[in-house]
From Swiss-Prot:
Name of this protein: Nitrogenase vanadium-iron protein delta chain
Keyword match Phosphoprotein: no
Keyword vocabulary terms for this entry: ATP-binding, Iron, Iron-sulfur, Metal-binding, Nitrogen fixation, Nucleotide-binding, Oxidoreductase, Vanadium
The protein's assembly and partners: Hexamer of two alpha, two beta, and two delta chains.
Function: The key enzymatic reactions in nitrogen fixation are catalyzed by the nitrogenase complex, which has 2 components: the iron protein (component 2) and a component 1 which is either a molybdenum-iron protein, a vanadium-iron, or an iron-iron protein.
Domain of life: Bacteria
GO terms of biological process kind: nitrogen fixation
Entry's Gene Ontology molecular function annotations: ATP binding; iron-sulfur cluster binding; metal ion binding; nitrogenase activity
Signal peptide extent: none
Encoding gene, per UniProt annotation: vnfG
Organism: Azotobacter vinelandii
Amino acid sequence: MSQSHLDDLFAYVEERCLWQFFSRTWDREENIEGVLNQVGRLLTGQEPLRGTPQERLFYADALAMANDVRERFPWASQVNKEEIEFLLDGLKSRLVDVTITRSTNRELNHHLY
């Protein structure tokens, strides 16, 4: 796993995934965690969670992302489960930093939302 793999995934999410930009901090955190956990399950051959409507929603977004990752990035088929988990943890951290921590959108934490 290299920094370039993390950069590849981050650029992909920034370009293609709207779930990272929900209107509240807790929504963004929930989506980042939920979708990327499902992506991890799909990329490592585990059965995705689909027991609740929320899990099915995350699964739908994750399925498209996992398929795109396999198609766009040849390295995705060469990394093991631990590397995928490490990579997705790094991606989660970067997304939280960019879309929540350093966001200038004051509505994210507005008390009336």
